[in-house]
């Protein structure tokens, strides 16, 4: 099984990666190039850290090639100034749509978008 996860350095994403690795899956985590939280990711030969932000998700498709499931947990701009910014949120929506397109290009049978971002 091949799994793609955005937001993998967050609480939910990192635990989801660990769960799938325990089940023997090959896990591709798409991580912002400027992320300072890579230490939360497990060390595992089946874990592939792909430097990729929401603005260039489609660039990762050629590296991953194919996947069974795509879990989209990333969202930028969760601080007070950015959460109220239409420009930042428009980028998030565009990135989410690109995640759906990437999942389709990777022939994923399942796509899940989840997170706590709407609670803020």
Spell out what each predicted region is.
Residues 6, 68-73, 113-114:
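Rossmann-fold scaffold of SDR-type NAD(P)-dependent oxidoreductases
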Residues 25-35:
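Conserved glycine-rich Rossmann-like NAD(P)H-binding loop of the short-chain dehydrogenase/reductase
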Residues 56, 69, 95-98, 110:
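Conserved cofactor-binding/catalytic machinery of classical short-chain dehydrogenase/reductase
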